[in-house]
């Protein structure tokens, strides 16, 4: 697990953590003054993520899911079981935020209950302490893929990369949606 931490004298906590054999990025976002945080795409090593959060004296209250693929939220993948939101919820009482078009996929791959998911739509907001997260529906990689705008930062999951965009050759993906 490797960490990139952008230190800035602001209210925003944002930490990028590379995790898992696919070198996914998980983010810890939240409020510096309240120490309240959410984990974006909690998958692979939930114990290490929670240990890191505890070391920083953060209080994790939510999980923000960009899309339902197991490498981003946990579940069965290629004959392996990836730890994710189900394991996180087993250790901490968090709320799971997924786009309304993605909720059924999150339930299917993770095994959590539909009632465990807060279904959001594009433009909805969430306050994490004194920091506001705006949900942005960005279909293409999956029908309910979403990004998160936090102050002047975009957390994009598998929608956007430095050198391209997420795959559009997977079941449920749509090239036209990705490029609009």
What are these regions (language model features)?
Residues 17-18, 117, 137-139:
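Short Gly/Pro-enriched turn/cap motifs at secondary-structure boundaries
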Residues 125, 132-137, 142-180:
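Metallo-beta-lactamase
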Residues 34, 45-132:
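Active-site HxH/HxHxD metal-binding segment of metal-dependent hydrolases
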Residues 1-9, 13, 173-180:
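Accessory terminal helices/loops
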Residues 4-58, 147-157, 162:
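Conserved beta-strand hairpin/beta-sheet module of binuclear metal-dependent hydrolase folds
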Residues 7-14, 105, 130-133:
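Short Pro/Gly-enriched beta-strand edge/turn motifs at strand-loop
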Residues 40, 66, 98, 136, ...:
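Active-site flanking residues adjacent to catalytic metal/cofactor-binding acidic residues
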Residues 26-28, 49, 75, 79-80, ...:
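Short, function-defining helix-loop hinge/capping sites that tune catalysis or transport
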